[in-house]
Amino acid sequence: MSFIDEAKIYLKAGNGGDGCSSFRREKFIEFGGPDGGNGGNGGNIIFYTSHHINTLLYFRYKQHIKAENGNPGSSKKKSGSSGKDVIIKVPIGTQLYDEDGMLITDLNEENQKFIAAHGGKGGIGNANYKTSTNRAPRHFTFGKRGEEKHIILKLKIISDVGIIGLPNAGKSSFLASCTNSKTKIADYPFTTLEPHLGVAFIDNTELVLADIPGLIPGAHLGHGIGDKFLKHIERCSILLHIIDCTLDNIIESYECIRKELSFYNKELSNKTEFIVLNKSDLLDKKEINQKKQILSNHTKKEIFISSIKNNRYPILSTLIKQIHKKYTNTKPHIYDPFNI
C-alpha cells in the first residue's frame, strides 16, 4: 500500500432545505391557517481518527467530498429530513490546514472527531411566522448554503520510537526483527522509501516503532528523500539511532544525523536518544569494543550492540520499554484484544 502523508481536498457540506409556504386545506374549514414546515439541515463533513488507518491514501482517489443537502419542508407542518453526514476516517496525527497554510486543528487522539465543513441550516416554514396580528403569513426562508472550502491534510505519524540513521544502516532489519513489520530489506542505500510502522508487544504493553527513510547531509534542505519524512520524527517519544559499525568514521556518521535533526527542528535534538551500533557480526569483538568506547566517549551515552545474527528482541525491546516509561509522561498503550 502506498504511503501518502499530504493531500489537498475540496469539501462541500450540504445545503439546508427550504422552508415551505402552504395553508391547511380541508373540507368545511375555510381558514385553515399556515402549515408550512421547516427545511432539514444540510449534512456535515466530519473527520474521525482511527488507529486502523496509517496513510492518507484514500484522498488520492477521492479529492472532492460532498455531503447531502437537507430536504425542503412540506405542508401539514412536516419538516424536511436532514442530509446525512459524511464521516471520513483518517490516521491519528492528521493535521488540517486552510489554503493559507494556517493550522485548523490537530487530530492527535484516538476516536477524535472534528467537523471540517458545517452543513447549512434549514429554512423556516410559514407556520412559524403566524402571530396574533398576522394570521395568514406567506413568508418563509430559504435554507442556508453549506460550507465550501479547500483544505490541506498533513500526516505526522505518532509513534513511541522513531528509528533514524544513515541509509543502509540496518534500520529496516532492526524493525523487522523486533516486530512483524514486512518492510523491504536489501543491501543498498534508500531501500526504505517511506515510513514503516511496527508494533512490539512486551508484557501486554504495546510499543509503536517507526522506521524513517535514511537521512543524508543536507536532508533538511531537500537532499535525498529524508526531508519530507523528518516531520514524522517530531511526535516520537524516543529516537533510536542506528549506526553502521563498519563505517570508518562512526563519529562523523553520528554527528551527521544529529546536525540534520537540529537544522530541521532544534527540539528534535533534545529528544531522548538510544544509540545502537549495528552489523556487529561483520567485525571482530576487539574492533566492536573500540568503536563502542569511541562513540561512548563522544556522546557520553551508553552504546548498545546489535547484529542480524543476535536475537535482539528480548533485550532491546525490554530496554526500549524501560526508557519509554522513564522519559515520557504518556501512558503506555495497553493491548486490548477486544478493541477491534
UniProtKB/Swiss-Prot annotation:
Cellular component, GO, one term: cytoplasm
Positions contributing to GTP binding: 165-172, 190-194, 211-214, 278-281, 306-308
Pfam family membership, one: GTP1_OBG
Domain OBG-type G: 159-325
Sample GO molecular function, one term: GTPase activity
UniProt domain Obg: residue ranges: 1-158
Entry cofactors: Mg(2+)
Its EC number(s): 3.6.5.-
Binding site for Mg(2+): 172, 192
Subunit structure: Monomer.
Family stated for the protein in its record: Belongs to the TRAFAC class OBG-HflX-like GTPase superfamily. OBG GTPase family.
Purpose of the protein: An essential GTPase which binds GTP, GDP and possibly (p)ppGpp with moderate affinity, with high nucleotide exchange rates and a fairly low GTP hydrolysis rate. Plays a role in control of the cell cycle, stress response, ribosome biogenesis and in those bacteria that undergo differentiation, in morphogenesis control.
NCBIfam families assigned: Obg_CgtA, PRK12297.1, PRK12299.1
Protein name from the UniProt record: GTPase Obg
